[in-house]
Amino acid sequence: MPYHSSTKSRAVSTWLLVVAALVCAMIIIGGTTRLTDSGLSITEWKPISGAIPPLSQQDWQDEFALYQQTTEFQVQNSAMTLDEFEFIFWWEWGHRQLGRLIGLVYFVPFVFFWMRGHLSARLKSRLFGLFLLGGAQGAIGWWMVASGLSDRLDVSQYRLATHLGMAFVILGLSIWFSLEARHGPPPLRRGRLAGVTAGLLGLVFVQIILGAFVAGLDAGRIYNTWPLMNGDLIPEGYLGGMNFFPAIFESHAAVQMHHRWTGYLVALGVFAYAWQVWREPRVSLKPFMVILPALVIGQIALGIAALLAVVPLSLSLAHQAGAILLFIAMVAAAWTARRAV
């Protein structure tokens, strides 16, 4: 049966959507791991044997002893009990275990579809590249964790942003390739709004990365007022005593301010884009005229609520979930715009 058979393309498309759904779950669990300070509870990287959790009391004592050597424990959690350690351990273990599951869910069907001839040459190369990105993501995750096992209390915000950024790249490509598997590659001629949509997708991605810096620095726990930052448009401690270049990534005030203002810029861009889509004669992009503004309004509301409540876990995760939905919608819009000719 040829590649363009609807049965085979639907199967490949559905598989990639399952992978994308698992990546979404991975991002949410990763966010929970970060917000509960669970990320440093496993101090070793064992891709194979690490799949087996502690099975005896002695195993738990051994894992706890390793964690007790970290700066995070010695400075911040020295009163932690074994039961409390088990709580944070399970979050980090679950995060890593889901990563292993995603690897299996991706690799086994990938080999099957390849061997059965269900993939075009174009999709083979792209899906193999996506497989390599998944492997790199595991290494990036450990590289991030390792940054918190020295004299730091938390992992590096730079490495956290890299890890989250790669997760969204993998998510976006999974959805893009799923759409391509179902509908075929986009035409060589791009739609009129293709460039604008791609630019807006890039801006949303930048905003997500800025959110990672806010999370990495716990910058949402200060300036818990809105619309101003403790009464100021530009907070008094913007540079935090640093030069401009490191300050824009390391000053809590600067990082939060940039995340706020880029959010407003995303909203402005989305509403301008919706107006352009409204004027567009072709109907394929019309649903995004409603979907994108609704998601942006909801996301801004969640961000403000989380800030005013000093980033409780529930609102923070809802805000992260909103970012995932907005990103997915933007990927779908970008893909649709390339075909709207």
Curated annotation (Swiss-Prot):
Report the GO terms under cellular component. plasma membrane
Give the gene symbol: ctaA
Cofactor names: heme b
In its UniProt entry, the species of origin is given as Maricaulis maris (strain MCS10) (Caulobacter maris)
Predominant localisation class: membrane
| Example GO BP | heme A biosynthetic process
| PANTHER family assigned to the protein according to its UniProt record, in alphabetical order | CYTOCHROME C OXIDASE ASSEMBLY PROTEIN COX15 (PTHR23289), CYTOCHROME C OXIDASE ASSEMBLY PROTEIN COX15 HOMOLOG (PTHR23289:SF2)
UniProt-annotated binding residues for heme? H259, H319
Q: Does the keyword Protein transport apply?
A: no
| One Pfam family from the record | COX15-CtaA
This protein's UniProt keywords: Cell membrane, Heme biosynthesis, Iron, Membrane, Metal-binding, Oxidoreductase, Transmembrane, Transmembrane helix
Q: Where in the cell is it found?
A: Cell membrane
Q: What is this protein called?
A: Heme A synthase
Q: How does this chain assemble? A: Interacts with CtaB.
Transmembrane stretches, start-end: 11-31, 101-121, 127-147, 160-180, 194-214, 261-278, 288-308, 315-335
Pathway of this protein? Porphyrin-containing compound metabolism; heme A biosynthesis; heme A from heme O: step 1/1
The membrane-topology field of this record reads: Multi-pass membrane protein
